[in-house]
Amino acid sequence: MGSGPEAGQESGLAVRLLEQFLRAGVRPEAALKTLNSALALRGEETGGFTTVDLLRLDLFTGEAAVYKYGAAPTYVRKGKTVSRITGSALPAGLAGGDGAAPDVAKVRLEAGDWVLLVTDGVAGSDSDLWVRQRFAAFEGESPKDLTQALIDESAGHGGATDDRTALVLRLEKR
């Protein structure tokens, strides 16, 4: 996606469009294909594209789907085991304007599981082993604490050259 104000504007536009599609009841895969086509058409004039990482979670069943267009890995932690979800689709806007599908991975989550979504500014372009190790070893209870630790540590792992964003979810039973 890049970094700086232009990349921020492009990703902001993508988020707004995707939110509108989803709030209107469009299913995630159709919404993402439409977003990809819209960005591809827009890109013919402005060269715009963006990575997309979308997590859909049914809080009643625990069924989750991770949708990706060119996004950094997503990590799921169950106990101390961390799995890595990746994809091969190009960023939205570059993935072909004909409604090319995003990568989709399905996973079942339950109380006590954690999900980590990061940008490539956190995961870096080198090995992301440090992210997986840090995520597996985290002993705290606060997603906010883990998020801040990952952002802070990413600068030492090649992430300082790009925008850095991390989102941590911990599922709890209520």
Q: What does each model-found stretch correspond to?
A:
Residues G2-P5, Q9-R174:
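Conserved subregion of the PPM/PP2C metallophosphatase catalytic domain
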